[in-house]
Amino acid sequence: MFHPIEEALEALKKGEVIIVVDDEDRENEGDFVALAEHATPEVVNFMATHGRGLICTPLSEDIAGRLDLHPMVDHNTDSHETAFTVSIDHKLTKTGISAQERSFTIQALLDEESVPGDFQRPGHIFPLIAKKGGVLKRAGHTEAAVDLAKACGSQGADVICEIMNEDGTMARVPEISEIAKSHQLKMITIKDLIEYRYNITTLVNREVDITLPTDFGTFRVYGYTNEVDGKEHLAFVMGDVPFNSGPVLVRVHSECLTGDVFASHRCDCGPQLHAALRQIAEEGRGVLLYLRQEGRGIGLINKLKAYRLQEQGYDTVEANEALGFLPDLRNYGIGAQILRDLGVQHMKLLTNNPRKIAGLEGYGLSISDRVPLQMEASEHNKQYLQTKMKKLGHLLHF
């Protein structure tokens, strides 16, 4: 159903329109996307006729800044924080609404000789400002379009249009697939674009490495920063870096302040952390990644709010969903980049979570074996562990 990102890029370079679909838990919509330089009157008319939604022009912050395109509102209350600027028309257009005139305005946005005074405000073209970091910062159609443009070697501007059904309802994947098939368009997902970017873009910087004696042995600790969100991650290493031969014992551990530091009995995170360090030390060779993904990615305060809901009878999955989050928001692309920086290509993964295996393999790493890391359940965390087993697919046995 969906095409590889590489095929979509080739289609865009040829001037074709593609379709980009986001996740079911977000807008669950598809947009037509074309590079701004190929936004001919025919392309604009195609989008207006078959998309029926609002035609917008995602732009990089650089282009928006050069043309003095400011946010439409000072306080954005849109649920997805879509960054509209004030709408525009080129000053040489008449009504500005025809396909020809909208195409003219879009093309002028790309002209490096264009100045802010060349555009009237308001108008019939709706620029959108993409966040720096693209889909790795915000998984929206705006960022996806600009990321695709940049990957094509373009300036970072596109034209997009939401796809609606003939009855005025929003088209979902089944209807969008039929549209793609009938018009022979490439169709991709933002999720696949995120994985593509993690695989082609280096987003971590090794900042420091030191020797750290611990209760489990002496480790070499490498400190990394993430260019997307500025978070700091650690790699506890035993053995010589880079790891150039044989599978390496690896644990990818997400931060849990309450469990790792304060020995909380609500989870098994602290015991897992210590057990993993002990096993790596016993093997004499391995890596423990400590990723700043508190509360399966929802953050410390939200995790505490989830705990409060659990006290009211929710399980760990239901609590996350009641707060408006997916059960697990973690992403392993940054972890995969750190492992690659350390020379890890093949590993034995300490985990009970099959999604973690799939997540790392999706970034080109090879996992030869899964090493279980099950801790003894307590009266305080037994229900939590059973929920992880039943609802999140963790490989646990009671």
UniProtKB/Swiss-Prot annotation:
<protein>
    <recommendedName>
        <fullName>Riboflavin biosynthesis protein RibBA</fullName>
        <ecNumber>4.1.99.12</ecNumber>
        <ecNumber>3.5.4.25</ecNumber>
    </recommendedName>
</protein>
<feature type="binding site">
    <location>
        <begin position="294"/>
        <end position="296"/>
    </location>
    <ligand>
        <name>GTP</name>
    </ligand>
</feature>
<dbReference type="Pfam" id="PF00926">
    <property type="entry name" value="DHBP_synthase"/>
</dbReference>
<dbReference type="GO" id="GO:0003935">
    <property type="term" value="F:GTP cyclohydrolase II activity"/>
</dbReference>
<dbReference type="GO" id="GO:0005525">
    <property type="term" value="F:GTP binding"/>
</dbReference>
<feature type="binding site">
    <location>
        <position position="27"/>
    </location>
    <ligand>
        <name>Mg(2+) 1</name>
    </ligand>
</feature>
<feature type="binding site">
    <location>
        <begin position="26"/>
        <end position="27"/>
    </location>
    <ligand>
        <name>D-ribulose 5-phosphate</name>
    </ligand>
</feature>
<feature type="binding site">
    <location>
        <position position="269"/>
    </location>
    <ligand>
        <name>Zn(2+)</name>
    </ligand>
</feature>
<keyword id="KW-0686">Riboflavin biosynthesis</keyword>
<feature type="binding site">
    <location>
        <position position="141"/>
    </location>
    <ligand>
        <name>Mg(2+) 2</name>
    </ligand>
</feature>
<keyword id="KW-0511">Multifunctional enzyme</keyword>
<feature type="binding site">
    <location>
        <position position="316"/>
    </location>
    <ligand>
        <name>GTP</name>
    </ligand>
</feature>
<dbReference type="InterPro" id="IPR016299">
    <property type="entry name" value="Riboflavin_synth_RibBA"/>
</dbReference>
<keyword id="KW-0378">Hydrolase</keyword>
<keyword id="KW-0460">Magnesium</keyword>
<keyword id="KW-0547">Nucleotide-binding</keyword>
<comment type="function">
    <text>Catalyzes the conversion of GTP to 2,5-diamino-6-ribosylamino-4(3H)-pyrimidinone 5'-phosphate (DARP), formate and pyrophosphate.</text>
</comment>
<dbReference type="GO" id="GO:0008686">
    <property type="term" value="F:3,4-dihydroxy-2-butanone-4-phosphate synthase activity"/>
</dbReference>
<feature type="binding site">
    <location>
        <position position="272"/>
    </location>
    <ligand>
        <name>GTP</name>
    </ligand>
</feature>
<comment type="similarity">
    <text>In the N-terminal section; belongs to the DHBP synthase family.</text>
</comment>
<dbReference type="InterPro" id="IPR032677">
    <property type="entry name" value="GTP_cyclohydro_II"/>
</dbReference>
<feature type="site" description="Essential for DHBP synthase activity">
    <location>
        <position position="124"/>
    </location>
</feature>
<comment type="similarity">
    <text>In the C-terminal section; belongs to the GTP cyclohydrolase II family.</text>
</comment>
<feature type="binding site">
    <location>
        <position position="351"/>
    </location>
    <ligand>
        <name>GTP</name>
    </ligand>
</feature>
<dbReference type="GO" id="GO:0005829">
    <property type="term" value="C:cytosol"/>
</dbReference>
<feature type="active site" description="Nucleophile; for GTP cyclohydrolase activity">
    <location>
        <position position="330"/>
    </location>
</feature>
<keyword id="KW-0342">GTP-binding</keyword>
<dbReference type="InterPro" id="IPR000926">
    <property type="entry name" value="RibA"/>
</dbReference>
<dbReference type="GO" id="GO:0000287">
    <property type="term" value="F:magnesium ion binding"/>
</dbReference>
<comment type="function">
    <text>Catalyzes the conversion of D-ribulose 5-phosphate to formate and 3,4-dihydroxy-2-butanone 4-phosphate.</text>
</comment>
<feature type="binding site">
    <location>
        <position position="256"/>
    </location>
    <ligand>
        <name>Zn(2+)</name>
    </ligand>
</feature>
<dbReference type="InterPro" id="IPR036144">
    <property type="entry name" value="RibA-like_sf"/>
</dbReference>
<dbReference type="GO" id="GO:0009231">
    <property type="term" value="P:riboflavin biosynthetic process"/>
</dbReference>
<comment type="pathway">
    <text>Cofactor biosynthesis; riboflavin biosynthesis; 2-hydroxy-3-oxobutyl phosphate from D-ribulose 5-phosphate: step 1/1.</text>
</comment>
<feature type="binding site">
    <location>
        <position position="31"/>
    </location>
    <ligand>
        <name>D-ribulose 5-phosphate</name>
    </ligand>
</feature>
<feature type="region of interest" description="GTP cyclohydrolase II">
    <location>
        <begin position="200"/>
        <end position="398"/>
    </location>
</feature>
<keyword id="KW-0862">Zinc</keyword>
<feature type="binding site">
    <location>
        <begin position="251"/>
        <end position="255"/>
    </location>
    <ligand>
        <name>GTP</name>
    </ligand>
</feature>
<feature type="region of interest" description="DHBP synthase">
    <location>
        <begin position="1"/>
        <end position="199"/>
    </location>
</feature>
<dbReference type="GO" id="GO:0030145">
    <property type="term" value="F:manganese ion binding"/>
</dbReference>
<feature type="binding site">
    <location>
        <position position="267"/>
    </location>
    <ligand>
        <name>Zn(2+)</name>
    </ligand>
</feature>
<dbReference type="GO" id="GO:0008270">
    <property type="term" value="F:zinc ion binding"/>
</dbReference>
